[in-house]
């Protein structure tokens, strides 16, 4: 399941001041990395770059967890384009780099870092879920927020 057409992304220039300038580094963390390596690496990136969404996070806080998650989803959907990474290349961008690259597009790993960072700044417990569709390997990752009764947002 992939995006079939580009959507119009809002400018977001009113939020630019909330993000530090990104470091334009693209280090290779591990050659031949697996999905499991990526899943383990994302929380590390979130911890190391948590300050990058600390000014944005309070602006997205709603009156409850559900409203907050909705605000985060709408912000990301309207301000950051999706674009799958090149085959064989997995980029894990910091939130500042993801914001900078928002018109070009970022993939689900980078969306996950961005959203997980906001949730972490708001002290909202969440997990990362990986899934696959019609292929034998995992293709998608996204954050989920547990709710009472065993459900997830």
Model features per residue range: what roles?
Residues 17, 78-79, 100, 104, ...:
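Histidine (H) residue identity feature
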Residues 21-103:
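Secondary-structure boundary elements
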């Amino acid at each position: 399941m992939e995006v079939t057409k580009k959507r119009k992304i809002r400018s977001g220039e009113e939020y630019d001041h909330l993000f530090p300038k990104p470091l334009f580094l693209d280090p290779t963390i591990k050659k031949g990395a697996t999905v499991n390596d990526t899943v383990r690496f994302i929380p590390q990136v979130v911890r190391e770059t948590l300050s990058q969404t600390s000014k944005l996070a309070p602006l997205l806080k709603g009156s409850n967890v559900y409203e907050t998650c909705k605000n985060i989803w709408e912000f990301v959907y309207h301000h950051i384009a999706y674009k799958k990474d090149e085959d064989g290349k997995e980029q894990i961008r910091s939130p500042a780099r993801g914001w900078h690259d928002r018109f070009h597009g970022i993939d689900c790993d980078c969306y996950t870092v961005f959203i997980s960072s906001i949730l972490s700044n708001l002290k909202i417990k969440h997990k990362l879920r990986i899934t696959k569709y019609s292929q034998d390997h995992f293709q998608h990752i996204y954050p989920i927020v547990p709710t009472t009764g065993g459900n997830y947002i």
